[in-house]
């Protein structure tokens, strides 16, 4: 997302991504608290929850809850997973010249295996590998940044100048105005940290904590790490290496930057890291959306949903990156609207939970 934001909105998009993330901390805190407060158990006794539950139970609007469920099924289950498949296919084509249809079939098969029943095995593997890959990615990024320290101040200048005058920041390389900088910064920031979208509450609902506000604080920490550490590293690698050329976009821009910074291994480095990150995202988004399929129509249509997701994953491998991102922006917005309405309507509920947590914490008690 960050590479696309820079390529389409200029370096200034990063500034607006920071602004969106700053305000998103309050948003994601509220989402996590409400997910905890309005969670329930399914027919098998498993914890479940999310915006559909706090919209229907908290606001008392089953219509708005149904609208959200339909929107998230399309936004994450279908379009969102197209984005991930598109990124994987693009990365492996750039790095290893693997045809997109080959990567598409590979992604289709592995995703199908996961959805049908291999989730525990893959989840166990991902649990071990993703933190390792994240650490390797951070080390690779820091290596490039520290070997290009002279470019850090210039990168900061490009970000702050570009936030209000994108043409001046890039010398006209990126033909974007302030509207594009704000739009793509906020949109890609939303896609990256998911604050306000209504996706992460499904994960927060099943977390076992002593107090709802405790999960809210954990959500804030997660957002901070995602946007202000990982995303910033990618942004500074792109800007410090001078990879921005006005024509390269998406994952190809990130790969170009890492190749300039690490040499020929940069392409493959990004492709392999992305494979792990994108697959865990596909799994997570599939199950977030599946919860809403069950909320709407029960388990009888889950198989149909599963087949459709696999079809969209395959299609995502072939489509042009710009079209995929435009579709993602549209449906992410539709998903966020009912969720934000609920966050505003239930703000007093969140406030009371936070007040209770603070009162107990300051009194030396264990908040629960």
Task: Please give the residue ranges for each predicted region.
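Extracellular/periplasmic helix-exit of transmembrane alpha-helices
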Residues: 29-37, 140-158, 166-173, 205-209, ...
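A generic transmembrane alpha-helix motif of multi-pass inner-membrane proteins
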Residues: 180, 301-355, 366-368
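Extracellular loop-to-transmembrane helix junctions
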Residues: 6-46, 225-233, 267, 329-342
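Helix-loop-helix module between adjacent transmembrane segments
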Residues: 23-45, 51-115, 272-282
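Membrane-interface loop-to-helix entry segments
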Residues: 86-92, 98-160, 293, 298, ...
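Flexible loop linkers connecting adjacent transmembrane helices
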Residues: 2-14, 18, 28-59, 244-261, ...
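Transmembrane helix-loop junctions in multi-pass membrane proteins
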Residues: 1-5, 11, 78-89, 113-125, ...
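Transmembrane helix-boundary motif of multi-pass solute transporters/channels
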Residues: 1-20, 200, 205-207, 214-215, ...
